[in-house]
Amino acid sequence: MARQDRLRELLGPLHPYKSDDEEEDCAQEEEGEQEEEFVDAEELCSGGIKAGSLPGRARVSIPDEYTKEKCTVYGRFPLKGPWWRVKVQVLKPQRSRSYQVQGFPAYFLQVDMSPPDQKQICSLFLKECNLASERIQEFLKWVEKVSSFENLHFENLWETLRLFYRETEKKDKKLSTPREQQGEEMRVEKSFAFISAMVALQFPKVMEFLPSLFPRHFKRLISSSSDWVLGCIEDVLGTQPWKLGFRRITYREMKLVRCEASWTAFSQCPSLLQLMTPLQKNALVIYSKLRQTCREDGHTYIEVKDLTSGLSEHMSFEEACQSLAFLKDIDVVIYEKDYVFLSELYEAEQDIASSICELMSRPPWHLKVDVKNVLASIRGAKPNDPGSAEAVEGSKPEEVGSEQGDSVLDAQDGDDHVRSNGEHVANAEINDVPLDQDQVVALETICANAVTVLSGKGGCGKTTIVSRLFKHMEHLEETEVQQACEDFEQDQEASEEWLDCPKQSPAGVDKAVEVLLTAPTGKAAGLLRQRTDLPAYTLCQVNYSFYMWKTKNEVDKPWKFSTVRVLVVDEGSLVSVGIFKSVLQLLCKHSKLSKLIILGDVRQLPSIEPGNMLQDVFETLKSRQCAIELKTNHRTESQLIVDNATRISRRQFPKFDAELNICGNPTLPLSIQDKTFIFVRLPEEDSRSQSSKGEHRSNLYTAVKTLLQGKDFCSFESSKTSQFIAFRRQDCDLINDCCCKHYTGHLIKDHEKKLIFAVGDKICCTRNAYLSDLLPDKDQEAEGKGYGDAPDDDAKIKQDFESSTRLCNGEIFFITRDVTDVTFKRKRLLTINNEAGLEVTVDFSKLMANCQIKHAWARTIHTFQGSEENTVVYVVGKAGRQHWQHVYTAVTRGRSRVYIIAQESELRSATRKRGFPRQTRLKHFLQKKLSGSCAPSTGFASQPSSPRVGGRPDTQPPASHLCRTPDNKATADSARGDERWLSASVNDDVDTDEESAQLRGSKRIGDGFPFDEESPSKFRMVEAPSPQVSSVFQNMRLNTLTPRQLFKPTDNQDTGTAGVADDANDPSNQEMEM
């Protein structure tokens, strides 16, 4: 209430601030504004208006018409210029001379150019319209001569300007040619200032309300929309403004992509609320609550009772039910039983289930490869000679696209690497090489099945074995082709043309992509590319490439990924259902996709967006022998990290091999060179004390400074091989401040709290952007390591590089050069390097506006997930909502050394706390579709006869509901199945009895992670056939059915046509006969 009293409304012309030479602060966005929403390929290809960036903050001066006070205001103003009149809500913080804008301004065009200042405003407006200064002066003199400025206003400005051109052309044709005049007119007409003024004349409601309702879409709407779109919005604002609150309606009726006004934005427009009925207002409130809950908790649905009870302060239960029915009628939500879904989330989970089921129902593509050969090659052994017998059954794959890079395939052992040309170390036999049986099973499953999910911690070899399998396939094909060429060359009748033709494809011709490696983030894709020495893309890049191909209308040129037969998705826990649905559908419809391989760790944090794709698919497919866990760690230097990750997954306190106490005089361990898991203990604090927050910041700063300056801590000599991770953003800010002073010697912010960037800084992008959007305008300084000075004949290659190279959200760069160019305009140029082969010089202002860079010595756990580093430092901070999965995910980011900075009590609290289970239905949808489609459960003929796979494959029924162990309470295995859903072990220091009692009533017990870490029997519980199931199904054959009689036949009945009945000895039958 006090805050409302301090709010003030200003109304007046928008004047520039007298000392406004500052740069727009585009990097300092609020936390909720940083999320860049994924756009589906169908929406991209629709030609609709997409969201842009928020306008940067700037200071302006507003002479208030109410009080006549000249107010300095700081906020986001998408349009600037004294010809605009604005209405804005402001708040003045204590000890501040500037008002802070709350929300966004409403714009009104001063049609009469604000007499008596028409001449000045007209001059400034034409200058903003890119008209030359001398031309402006000529026009102003002409206006004074033929008329007066009192008669000049925006409604007749364009006609007056065109009349000026015609008269000057008649008077003196030597001054300018008609073509030059047309060019000037075109520049004015195409300028953003002119377009926005004309839109304001024609659609005043659009200018008044859209800056608040659609802040990201506003500038793009008025600059690129047709009069039809703007007219639709103008009409809706005057009659049915509630429609603008639902993205499905704005897309369906106005072709606006992911565009909707929030309930908070509507609340700032009381005149629009007056046009809504109570039913429409309640629908907007419910929709806002549903979307907020799904975004914050990761759910794809909410139970009706939970949703309505959370809205009891806003509406009655009857009103909530009426509003939900209204939302269903307009196709915004979907009901299923007592569940309410957002339509797009329901469709995403349904479409994923349908696509996976379709893949598993297609004729299988079996890879006849000796997987032991493949695994032996990773360990440096000599495999059997891969002859032509090891080919692909059916149609042979074409060339598998590969781009050789500087990196080498990351082998499982630290010092063992695989040569990219397919050669292997000799003097070893396969039988002498100890193979990981989990990896054997995993590769045989991939070869035999259409869909495979592999889960395991970092270092278990998921990425290595998959990439090695397809490199092996590529090598087999190359060997076969080379042998065929040699045989043909030895043929005496071979033509000279064949012998003289080059064996290599021309430069610049891309190979067909058959194995598509993908990851959810740019950093994860970069790591995948570095480990496998194969091309890797983000899922968004695959999605966007289809859009680019569609918009170019190149019918004769196929889509880049139209030849894909295998899709590999790494870091599956980070993949949201929305983007996975889009990419999977694209490849199923527009490529030759035959195999899907998902890699990840089901124990890690799920995606930030709603859904729990990896875990849901894993749990569904494990009973069909298509989901495998790799348990063995192959990184010898990180065994303690893996062991502690196991303990944390059981919610047990980790074991440290070194400890550093932070107090007045920090005590250093004797030697830390050979330690891998180190506890940096902070002093315990009294949370009830008022000075607790200050003590925590002081202790954390001391701990970070001790690590950075300690002589024994060689891991921090370079920030390129170490990374700080924290749960809270405020802890990241403090660590970045300390690291910035240590590594580069400057502060991260100036006195106005603006970020400072300099040479040596470690930065990261928080939004995706293409390199072509970041280059300097003249492109003279944009000489990157990736392309350099391109000659004229290579201009297209250079252009393709710039348009295809993407700076991804989460990607880390180092600033290597900082230059300010003053030749034309004051332009700041930064040279940034990602330490993976890309170094480019970009325009600093464009980098800030498009990528919104931040310092990156410290990152939050959610933004660093999917990446890894040699040394990782995790700051627990105050536990709060933090639980064991946060700690688990953080420590598994470290390859060779992990530090944990925490109070022991906070660390214990975080590791003991259970996660928050996500409410999703993908598992249910997938089970239902697989059982209904009778898709083959697995390629048993190609599976190994390992007891771990177990069972009698020929007699096991496909996808029987009796095999769903968590729901089958009739078997003894089911009782043990409940145990596997509880991550705590018997030795855990947690009150498991109390928690178990709380969770017995829920299907998704505990964290929902599907198996105990080191219990193979629990992991593959359903693989061994149940005695009750096998005893029934083993003897069932369609050709051995015996006709049974339901009733005793009479004399005139044909006994040969009796129906199927129960056994004659069944008591029910005896009763019926009586």
Swiss-Prot record:
Reactions this protein catalyses: ATP + H2O = ADP + phosphate + H(+)
Chief localization: nucleus
UniProt entry keywords in alphabetical sequence: ATP-binding, Chromosome, Cytoplasm, Helicase, Hydrolase, Nucleotide-binding, Nucleus, Phosphoprotein
Modification type Phosphothreonine: residues: T992
Pfam families: AAA_30, UvrD_C_2
Enzyme Commission number, as recorded: 3.6.4.12
Name of the top EC class for this enzyme: hydrolase
Any one biological process term the GO annotation gives: DNA-templated DNA replication
Entry comment on modification after translation: Phosphorylated at Ser-942 by CDK2 during the G1/S transition, resulting in its nuclear export into the cytoplasm. As S phase progresses, its exclusion from the nucleus promotes the activation of long-range resection.
Biological function: 5'-3' DNA helicase involved in DNA damage response by acting as an inhibitor of DNA end resection. Recruitment to single-stranded DNA (ssDNA) following DNA damage leads to inhibit the nucleases catalyzing resection, such as EXO1, BLM and DNA2, possibly via the 5'-3' ssDNA translocase activity of HELB. As cells approach S phase, DNA end resection is promoted by the nuclear export of HELB following phosphorylation. Acts independently of TP53BP1. Unwinds duplex DNA with 5'-3' polarity. Has single-strand DNA-dependent ATPase and DNA helicase activities. Prefers ATP and dATP as substrates.
Identification of the protein by name: DNA helicase B
Organism whose genome encodes this protein: Mus musculus
